[in-house]
Structure formats: structure tokens, C-alpha cells
Amino acid sequence: MADPSPVTFLAGAGLCVDAGLDDSVRLAGKLMQYLQAKAAEPKNEEARTLLNLHYFILGGIRFQWGRQGANPDHPVNIEQIATAALRLRFRHEDPLAPYVSAWSERIVDLEDQQDGALERFSDVIFARLKEWLATPPSQQIEYLNRMTDLHGKEACISIFSLNYDLLLENALVNAHRPFVNGFRDGRWNPEVFSGNSDIRIYKLHGSLDWVEDEMYGICSLTFDRHPKAEDFEVQKPPLLIFGTNSKLTGRDPFLTLVHAFAQQLRSAKVLVAVGYSFSDKYINEIIEQRMRDNLPLRLVLVSPDADKIKQSNPFLENSPRVTTLNHWALDALNKGAVRSEILRLLEETKQEAPF
């Protein structure tokens, strides 16, 4: 009997919209509404400073887009806001800092108004994400299990997720489907991915249940829970990264995870991008490179805008190895369209394989 064929999923924010979660643009809108409501409270000077900082960051993002010839009215997402805030917070550690004669007076002014304003702003984002990305009831996330229906005889499923939420993990646990995610006894240990036949989950941008502790290192609070989690879980922000440049820092676990993605696509027969908008240049470069290196690799785009996404990316546009399913994730998964397309493409690659 032939070994199961390697099939890779790339999960974007659109995967979880059907479960009731907001995408990154809507999360940015929620952040503004939250800060505006807090700033309207009597004597809440901190909230007013954070709201002004939010407006300053939004203005900077749009100004930069205009300078680059891009549409400054394009929607800003939560990752772009968080990235800007974190870069400003740690601006004095930037290698280019010695060459900057002066930072914007507005940054200095806002920091004078509220000590640690940028740190507090980042903390607010992390705290709100935990609330806004909370896992819905089990019936709303059951459709996510359809991604792993072929795992076993037909395929070996690996899921690379760009999402911070815990919907996928909870869905698999509810369905009693074992998986590995790089943690053993609550501590980061990527060796668990090796030689394991379970479903594999790689969270490229981090996870709401990951933290970094000075004593225990990189730990998980839920899947699976570190035995000492109660000692540090309250005061630790989740271990997340925002934006492409963060992935280029070489920091673990993110270096290991993105390397695993690049390596996986060397041998994968099918890559299914579900709810991914192809807005991450670094991830796109990896996919483009592997489409050149791994000729049997087929790519399936699952999105209501799948055709538009294909046409707007030159390395996808004219490729006969790229197919589109113009559906939301829930319909495409529950109605069997994704499963059928994977099986069709696996059969196609078998017929093309040399004897």
C-alpha cells in the first residue's frame, strides 16, 4: 500500500469568519471603537492618550502608503497597527536609530502625557485580542474538522495557520482527533513533529495560549498546558508576531515554524490556501519559490474572492497548477468541495509521476 500523500493547508483569517470571528480589518475597527468608548469616560486621561496615539499611528500608516504610491484609503488591519506600535515602542533598539536625528515630536508629546503609553497601547491590543478571538460554541467550529477528514490512508495532513485563535485546536479536541503542535508537557519542543503520524499544526504567527517565561522558556497554557502555568499565565502577554519583518528576526519558535513551512512545500503534493488573501509578501515568496522547485505541487485557493486573488498575483495568474474554489470556507469544507479537489489533484499527480 502506498504511503499517504503529503497535503498542506495554509489557513488565513478567512477560515474562521464563518465561525463568527472578525477578520483583521474588522478587529482594527473594534479597537478604535473600544478606545473611543473608553476615552469618552469622565477623567479617563489614559484612554484619551491611547486614542490619540491610535490616531497618530493610523495617520502614519496612511501617510507612508501615500508616499509609496499606494491608496492611503485602503483599510488598515490590526496587524499593521500592532506592528507600528511595537516598532515605535522599541525604536531606540532599531539598528537605524543612530541615524535618526529626531523622532516625531508627537510621539514624545504622547509619551510625556502618559508614561509607557506605547507599552500600554500594545497591552490593550493583546488583551482585546484574547476577548475578541475567544472560541465560539463547538457547533460553530465543527466545520474546521473537514480539513483533516483525509488524514490517514489517503493523506498526511499538515496545517500551517496564520491565525492566533484556538478554534482549530478546540475543533480537533472536540472531535477526538489527535494532533501535535510543537509542545510537549507545555514546553516548546519542535522534535514532536518528527516521526509522528498525528495531524500537525504549525502556528506561524504565534498563538493566544503561548507565552514566554524567563524560567521555563516558551510555554503553552492550553494545548498542552504547562504544569506550572498558574505561576506565570496572568502577567504574561501572548506570544504573537505581527507583520512580515517580524518573521525575519530569526527568533524561535517562529524561525522553526516558517522553516518547516518552506520544507513541507518541497514534498507536498497539494497546498490548500483557505481564507488567505495573499497579502503576506514573505509567505507568498515561499509559495512562489516552491511552485518553481516542486513541479508536482498543486495549489487550491479557497475564498469567495479566489479568482480575483489568482488574477492579482503574477505567479498564480497563468499557472495551470492553480485551481480556485470561490466559496466561503464553511461551504467549501462541509459540502465536500475541498475534499473532492484534493483527491482529484492527488490522482492527477499520481498519473504524471514517472514509472
Regions found by a protein language model. Give the residues of each.
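Intrinsic-disorder/low-complexity, polar/charged segments
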Residues: 73-77, 91, 179-188, 328
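Surface-exposed, flexible loop/turn segments at secondary-structure boundaries
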Residues: 165-167, 209, 279, 307
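Active-site gating loop/helix substructures
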Residues: 103-138, 170-259
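A general structural signal for short secondary-structure boundary/capping elements
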Residues: 55-63, 201-211, 317-322
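Short flexible/disordered coil segments
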Residues: 67-79, 218-231, 314-317, 326-346
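A structural signal for short, well-ordered beta-strand segments and their strand-loop junctions
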Residues: 8-12, 158-163, 180-182, 200-205, ...
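SIR2/sirtuin-family catalytic core signature
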Residues: 1-19, 24, 28-30, 34, ...
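Gly/serine-rich nucleotide phosphate-binding loop at the start of the catalytic core
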Residues: 1-170
